Amino acid sequence: MKGSQGIPALQLVTLNKLISKFVIPPSNFFTNLFPSTQYDSDTIEWEMEYGSGGMTPFVAPGSVAPAIGIDGIGSGSAKAAYWKEKMYFDEEFLNNLREPGTYATYLTAERQLAKGAQKLRWRCDRRREWMVAQMLFNGTLSYLQAGGLKFSVSYGVPTSHFVTLDDSRNWKDGASRNPIEDIFDAKQLIIDDAMVTPNYSIMNSQMLKVLLFDSKIQELLAKSAFGNGDLFSRPAQVIASLLGIGNLTVYDELYEVQAWLTTTTTSSTTIYVDDATDFEAGGKVRFYDMTKYNTFEDEVIMSVDRAAGTIVVGAHPTSTFVGGRDKVVMRKKFIPDNVFFMFADAAGGSKVAEFMEAPYGNSRRWGFYADTKDEWDPEGVWLRVQDKGLPVLYNPDTTYKITAFDLDEY
């Protein structure tokens, strides 16, 4: 038998049962918070509502009931995003999985399959988490469509819900800084606009540190029941209780984006890569020499041209990195060090966001799916994972983002 034929563990039904058992990690905060739903096509449509605190009116007995629609006052429509990748397993792996030798050899191959499948599933779920985070933190989402075209979705978040503090108010060293007032103003705006009380606040550890050492917060803390050292033993809970900002989540997750160099680096600061879609200005790009162990250089990304497939860095790398051989990697936090984010996860009795799974493939499947393809010479098998969908935001006025200081100052 050739390839994966006759190997029960590589049958699609068995393979997908295995991968479906991998639990979405708790670190994927938004994926666990908001539900997923199957949509009827790959063109996702949704209604948007601004303000959702209405109630049924009184009427006189015997009178006609007033009508109310289920639709919001705005609508969105976009093609679903599609993502996939694959992993190769060689001939030795296939032979071991057929159990020609010892049982221990077979178990080793099974563990290799399970580890590879789990990594693919984890990366696929990570992409969903990134999409929801981009939608909430930035109010937009960009991705590739057919023909290599870049598609961007705007979710209709009011501009008043994105606030960048000026130098005098910045939370790090602004002369008139007042994080307490800014946070309460944000909370009040969500209440006034969306008619709901925000119950989640999100920041990373760097922003939490800025708040911990803020003089006004420490002064308030000294007058409260928390002046017993709790601020540093459980800082998130104390800050949340002190400011009345609901569940404060410290979200330190990072994501990684990779691309292969298409041309060899020179003295130019313009770098050509095979896919610049997910690279962002302000991040750091790491150049890896793939012929050497753990050899790299870091440069700051100044700008990105996704259509041209170029990244402009602050300074060209001192070493030469070869196109087609070496790669670049950007690592970036889901939420930047200078952002404080607040939102309500529900309005009008329903979740404010949802992930719409779109159908794809000849069998019209939804959500995560794994399949295989045999290689003839040398013998091996590719394990591929796929997913398709789009996050939607039903209540755009339930979020609020404060950019508290310039990252260059930190």
For every predicted segment, state its role.
Residues 1-58, 281-288, 304-305:
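A generic N-terminal leader/anchor concept
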Residues 80-158, 178-209, 379-387:
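Long, contiguous amphipathic alpha-helices that act as assembly "spine/axial" helices in icosahedral shell
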Residues 194-258, 330-354:
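Extended oligomerization regions of viral-like shell subunits
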